[in-house]
Each structure stands twice: as structure tokens, then as C-alpha cells.
Amino acid sequence: MGAGASAEEKHSRELEKKLKEDAEKDARTVKLLLLGAGESGKSTIVKQMKIIHQDGYSLEECLEFIAIIYGNTLQSILAIVRAMTTLNIQYGDSARQDDARKLMHMADTIEEGTMPKEMSDIIQRLWKDSGIQACFERASEYQLNDSAGYYLSDLERLVTPGYVPTEQDVLRSRVKTTGIIETQFSFKDLNFRMFDVGGQRSERKKWIHCFEGVTCIIFIAALSAYDMVLVEDDEVNRMHESLHLFNSICNHRYFATTSIVLFLNKKDVFFEKIKKAHLSICFPDYDGPNTYEDAGNYIKVQFLELNMRRDVKEIYSHMTCATDTQNVKFVFDAVTDIIIKENLKDCGLF
């Protein structure tokens, strides 16, 4: 009888210990939801977490990006070539017109993700053309990957035999996120589960079941989107869409107690763009100086003023460049400190 009771006690103690361990583990688990409109930079942040908090990209993994990088490069030059027609821009050298036709034909016949020498030669000739450059300058008038200039101006390196993509090449690559991608890593004694959710409108209905028990939402908005329209609706300004989405998330009943951090991303692209295109394109009421600081601050205020519970809920914001590892490292460190302060003070661990 006594032996049975002590075995029961032992079992009970073990169970109690396990429950305590589980509770501690749960308290140390941070669920992070990355939200934002399409092409705002969510997946680039995920890649940075792999570089900063995991072991980065192995040689094999880097090599897997070659096909994506070649595909991105080809799609970018094709988008510019098509825009030459729609924007009625003339080639600087009429011989490039034949190159463009040849490229269109080749694009339909080559194996996807490859870059034959004849094709890379044509692309390099086209990229040097003054008409193509003029068209590239007007990229906000059609859909063009942010990485277009990065890859096209460095194509010679990308097609060198034995080419291995660098971390920056990998970070710049673009694949549309469909569904939900989870990344796990540890940092500052916490276990992070980060969920990247497709941003295009068709993807948004998949978000809902991710909402439960989320510790923190990182909402990503592209600063540089102020003069651009959506891929899925060319009547809607991308910045307006982003504000609309942020409004619905930061005031959602699901997130009453969730920490929200705003990443105003692509600050590098915005820095260059604001010199040429006035912010009033997006915000007709804006009459302040068209500088990086003033215009950037105005955009930040537009987002933060949507928070209906400003008196009790603070939304933290950061200007970010998702392709800059040091910048992301610094900002994520600050975000983690916010999470520790806001969400873990109640559990007695910190």
C-alpha cells in the first residue's frame, strides 16, 4: 500500500515538474506574425533571420537560388521591354529593337531559370541602351521588381562560370509567398516561431487561423510604395492599401493585447525616390518639404494615427532596409527587448 502511494506521489511530482517545464517553455516561446501587403519585404526579413539567428545559407542552398535569380533578371528586363511599348519610349539604338524581339522569343523557348550566353549578351546590350534606362527611371508606372537594377547592372558577374550567389544576391531574390511559412530560431533565451504570410489579397484569407496566441505582430509597409499601384488592382495605390490593411489589423479585437511593431521598409529605395517623385502623389494634403526625413515622418504618422487605442496601446515603429543585415539585426534586437518588456513581465521569468 505504502509503495503504491509513494509511486503515485513520485508520478505526481514528475507530472508537476513537467507541467512547470512546459509552462516555462510556453512562456519563453514567442509567436511572431509578419503581416503586410504584397512585396513589402516580409520574406526578406525571414531570410535575414536565417542569416542572423540560424547558420545562414549553405553552399548548396545558395546554388538553389541561381534559377530564381536568373528568372528574376529575365522577368525584370522583359517588364522594361514591354513598358517601352506602353510608355511609347524609343530605343537609343534602333538595333536594340531586334534584340528585344529576339529576347521575347527566347524567353518562351528556353528552360526556365537558365541563362544561355546569347541571352545574357542581349540583356546586357539592352540594359546599356539609353531608351531602356529612361524606361527604367519610370518604373513606378508599371510593375517591376525592386531587385531589377541590382541584378541587371551586375549580370556579367551573375553569368560567370562557377557563379555562387552571395548573401546579398539571395536576399534580393523574389519568389511570391503563397500560404504560410514558419521559421524557428532562438535568441536572448527565447524560442521564436515566425510566420510569414502571403501579402497579396488572394492570400489574406489564410491568415485567420494564425492569429491565436500571437505574441507580437511585425507589420511591414514599403515606404517606397507611395507612387505605385497594386499588382492585383492597378487602380489602388500600394501605400493606401497598406494603410487600409494596417488599420484593420491594429484595431482588430484579436489583437487587443498583442504587441505591434511597424517596420517602414525599403528606406533605401525611398531615399532615392523621394528626390524625384513628390509625396503628394499619394497624400494630396501633404505640403511639407519633400525630404527623406519630413516625408518619411509624415508617412509614419499616417500609420500611427490609425491606432484607435493610442492612450493604452503603443505601436513601435522603425525605418528599415530588409536587405541590410546590420540594420535588421539592430532593429530585431530592439523588437526582442520590447517583447521581453511587454509580454514576459507577467510570467515571473524576467
From Swiss-Prot:
Modified residues (ADP-ribosylarginine): 174
Phosphotyrosine: residues bearing it: 142
GO CC terms, sorted: apical plasma membrane; cytoplasm; cytosol; heterotrimeric G-protein complex; membrane; neuronal cell body; photoreceptor connecting cilium; photoreceptor disc membrane
SMART domains the record matches: G_alpha
Tissue-by-tissue expression: Rod photoreceptor cells. Predominantly expressed in the retina followed by the ciliary body, iris and retinal pigment epithelium.
Gene3D superfamilies: GI Alpha 1, domain 2-like, P-loop containing nucleotide triphosphate hydrolases
GO terms for MF: acyl binding; G protein-coupled receptor binding; G-protein beta/gamma-subunit complex binding; GDP binding; GTP binding; GTPase activity; metal ion binding; protein kinase binding
Region spans: Disordered: 1-21
Chain positions covered by the region annotation G1 motif: 31-44
GO BP: any one term: dopamine secretion
Lipid-modified residues, N-myristoyl glycine kind: 2
Pfam families: G-alpha
Topology term for the membrane: Peripheral membrane protein
Entry-linked InterPro entries: Gprotein_alpha_I, Gprotein_alpha_su, GproteinA_insert, P-loop_NTPase
Positions contributing to GTP binding: 36-43, 146, 171-177, 199, 265-268, 322
Residues recorded as bearing ADP-ribosylcysteine in the entry: 347
Entries under SUPFAM superfamilies matching the protein: P-loop containing nucleoside triphosphate hydrolases, Transducin (alpha subunit), insertion domain
Protein residues bound to Mg(2+): 43, 177
Chain intervals for the UniProt region annotation (G3 motif): 192-201
UniProt domain G-alpha: residue ranges: 28-350
Family stated for the protein in its record: Belongs to the G-alpha family. G(i/o/t/z) subfamily.
Functional description taken from the UniProt entry: Functions as a signal transducer for the rod photoreceptor RHO. Required for normal RHO-mediated light perception by the retina. Guanine nucleotide-binding proteins (G proteins) function as transducers downstream of G protein-coupled receptors (GPCRs), such as the photoreceptor RHO. The alpha chain contains the guanine nucleotide binding site and alternates between an active, GTP-bound state and an inactive, GDP-bound state. Activated RHO promotes GDP release and GTP binding. Signaling is mediated via downstream effector proteins, such as cGMP-phosphodiesterase.
Protein name as it appears in the record: Guanine nucleotide-binding protein G(t) subunit alpha-1
The species this protein was found in: Homo sapiens (Human)
Organism classification: Eukaryota, Metazoa, Chordata, Craniata, Vertebrata
